[in-house]
Amino acid sequence: MKRARYISMVLGMLLLVTFLANCHLVEAARDKSSVLLVFNDQSGRGKEERLSEIAHEVLNRKINGLYEVVDSKQAEMRLAEDSHYEEDLPVLLSELEEYPATYVIYVELLPFKQVEGFNIIWHRKKMTANIGLRIIDKKNSKEIFRQEYNAVREDDTDYFFVGSSSMARKSLKGALFTVGEAISVHLPL
């Protein structure tokens, strides 16, 4: 009886090792979809705050490895002048026609909302980051998902200065976390 248990356990381990050894082959066999990630900063805060770098860093973590990422620098420069979040889908797709991607993730940072309150010894700053997200199936010219997200961050101090740029980065990171989760849920493999 003990011998039968031992043999079945060894066979089970052998099957498990064989299965785990071939898992990477299944992943490699899947054709990766190509994704164009476009981040458009329309916040009006300028380049000095590195908001675009932060956005790319956070969002690329969600898609790297699962998708083939298409270089988006040219597309971002082309779309940087105006807001395209409310634009009709055919117009936006015509702007991005030359880029070889199956899906487009269009993320637009809308203007921050800032509220300050202070008295003689206390200073409070509240910053809200608003982000518009569009996920587009470029191959079928269809919008998969569209939503606006926001994140509010507050900071208090007994000094008269709370950095606006640090508050902008904090609120942006909060909103980008939510956007990243939405991308994970709605972007097809």
Can you say where each PLM-predicted feature lies in the sequence?
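C-terminal/domain-edge helix-coil "capping" segments
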Residues: 23-34, 95-99, 114, 123-128, ...
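Short amphipathic beta-strand and strand-loop transition segments with alternating hydrophobic
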Residues: 109-119
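Compositionally biased, intrinsically disordered low-complexity regions
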Residues: 7, 20, 85-86
